[in-house]
Amino acid sequence: MRNEEKHALRRELRRARAQMGHQGRLAAGQTINRLLKRYIKKGRKIGVYWPMGNELRLDGFVRAAQKRGAKLYLPYIEPRSRRMWFTPYPANGVKQERKRGRAKLNVPQFAGRKIRVHGLSILFVPIVGMDRNGYRLGQAGGYYDATLAAMKYRLQAKTIGVGFDCQLVDTLPREPHDLPLDGFVSESGVLVFKHH
């Protein structure tokens, strides 16, 4: 599928998410955060993300995971390559190291000992769209795609897409390098994808 078709799809899916309204996203978000708690284990390293715009917020999950002793990590984008490292989720009051303004992605970056994605047990992946085969449509930055593709043969982390029901479609366009995720959690429940 050509880029302009992907752009149109992103626009459509973002519109659907926006049309849920603030209260709708809030209620669905609480349900999703509750469902995500099944992945919490003491000492388990879990990659989360910093939500942008109307992306699903993980606040409830983060609080529960911290309380129960899981180790949370946020993406740290290398300025020159498109690959991500992961740094420990900041304790309250920790100042962000820098803002990343390139490519319209204003993601706070935090200092700390960096690990690669294969050091995580679980990685929650933000989505613009998700299909029933486990393929995702992202923000178009390519950061998750590049990171997962580079770790393809070493990837121990379970990759879970998180988002709203309205972002789930039957099929999405895919590129040869795209890797399917292991699952998707929305307000309707948990989908597990079998890839064989």
List each model region and its residues.
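N-terminal active-site beta-alpha-beta segment that forms phosphate/nucleotide-binding
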Residues: 1-119
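Conserved phosphate- and dinucleotide-binding cores of soluble alpha/beta proteins
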Residues: 82-196
